[in-house]
UniProtKB/Swiss-Prot annotation:
Pfam name, any one: DNA_mis_repair
Organism: Leptospira biflexa serovar Patoc (strain Patoc 1 / ATCC 23582 / Paris)
UniProt keyword DNA damage, yes or no: yes
PROSITE patterns (UniProt xref): DNA_MISMATCH_REPAIR_1
Protein keywords: DNA damage, DNA repair
InterPro entries for this protein: DNA_mismatch_repair_CS (IPR014762), DNA_mismatch_repair_MutL (IPR020667), DNA_mismatch_S5_2-like (IPR013507), HATPase_C_sf (IPR036890), MutL/Mlh/PMS (IPR002099), MutL/Mlh/Pms-like (IPR038973), MutL_C (IPR014790), MutL_C_dimsub (IPR042120)
Gene Ontology CC terms, in alphabetical order: mismatch repair complex
Record carries keyword DNA damage: yes
Protein name: DNA mismatch repair protein MutL
Amino acid sequence: MGIIHSLSPDLINQIAAGEVIESTHSILKELIENSIDAGASKIEIATESAGLGRILVSDDGHGITKEDLPLAIKRYATSKIQTFHDLEHLFTFGFRGEALASIASVSRLVIESGTEGNRMAQRVVVEEGKVVSEEEIPFFQGTKIEIKDLFYNTPVRRKFLKTESGEEKKNRTRVQTMALGEPSIGFRYVQNGKEVFHVQKEEPLERVLSIYGENLRDHLLPVHSSRNGMTLRGFISHPDFYKSSRMGQFFFVNNRSVELKFSAQILKRCYGELLPSGAFPYAFLFFDLPREFVDVNVHPQKKEVRFLSEETITGILFQGITEVLRTSTPVEFLEMRRRLSMPIPYHSSADKSQFGGEGMSMGGPGFGFGMAGRGQAVWGSQNEEGNPLLGPSSIEGRAGFSLDGIGAGTNLHLLGDNLTKHNLFVPKKHYGVIFETFILAEAEDGLYIIDQHTAHERIRYEEVLRDLKSKAYKSQSLLTPIRLELTKEEAEEMIAEKHRFSELGITLEPFSGGTILIREVPSYIDPGKETETILDLWERFKSKDPEEKELYDEMAKCVACRSAIKKGDQVSDPIIGELLQRLSYCENPSLCPHGRPTLIKLTRKDLETMFHRI
């Protein structure tokens, strides 16, 4: 007797549900896509118990006719395609006719729908994939789909889901991402009876800010790139604003949210050294492509797509991002590109332009672009009182600060009264900066090359950590509180951890919706850096749960990274002297807080060996 047999239709649907329905968030995706395809101008979503108890998605789209309602839950029944040619020219999100059939096989399903020109709407009740009742109801335009008792007949599926809070977070992320991709549609999302967010039809930038916070407004750069009828549009963040994970990166192909396997590599190449190690830019990027150029039928959940020419897409992406970085951060971008890809010209003799306090001149053909509203950061300028400043100018030209208020005329040897000298690095004199990044200095034991950013980062890290451990800082009340604009759930999560911020001298207060007020900040955070430092710290909180000792360490790293001199910043001779002297008093002057080297040493013997003198 044969052992191979055909599966029942019910079992086939349940198996298919395992491919299409990964979790409750994948159900939300399928239902919202149906609403978008139906031409909805507003979509409302409600979930209870992470969607396992109840899911309701309603829209004002064109609806489903009485004749089509029973077919809507049949597998491979669809209004989207009829021929293979249609599959190659899709204008809709859905096309397989699998979603409702799969959902109906593992839940109790109710569909209500009304279409234009009818006096009554229709209602069908479905259990285990079969229609158990049909009736007419009062008319409304659009469709409502209610799902209850998800996976009631496949309990093993429930067992492998995350915790309820984990599933709720994934649901929020899914709905927000889909709302991000459709700014011309209004969205409202309610979770366990509480409104999570509500957005009206708006422009793409406003949709990004509505969902991910007004705090992004001043840090986003518009991207636009076109080639052969293909367009890239959207926004990326300025290099001074980033996250500690890729959770702020979103990519859409013809408004469909997708995972692009090459996106991380392209972003890394484009930003390069403009970002510190472990930092990831925000990206909200949309590809508008000819339908025949994209194959969306390559993944069960349509998470991935295939392009006719991936090289073309990566080229458009690279061109769009590099162009906006070149024009928005020209000094930093120019230096990074030259270090990465251009040969350094040979000079037979050194002059002031190469090794003096003004920095090395790197001018050349093809780089004669200007800068709108942003000047090259200069460390060591004179303020109104005539004191040297150790802080880069901001976009508005804000003055910086001095390193612990030490002026150029300070007797640096007196610092030893308050600091322990470790004698690992004792500079005698310096010879300026090369490549606007590396300081050349001489000590008794050799020639040192010092990275101005990582060196200053080490200094600031140890100073802030020392202040935190000894409680030597003061918290300063702000006359005008600083507003943090976040999503509602982010604001709630942040306020729930306000005791951690309080331990660091930061006072946070909930205001309304997703707004948080910063009432007090510690003296060790530089003026103008409060928002980005606190948000950076919050990103670190979310990725781990630091104890008090680690809390101080994370805060010191955040402040050091944000306040340190950057690559490309011009540094005056007095400030170089301060920097080197301060570095010599550090407990570990050879490494930055993230483990990167701050300096390398060439001994006299090393040099003589290189020149074959010994």
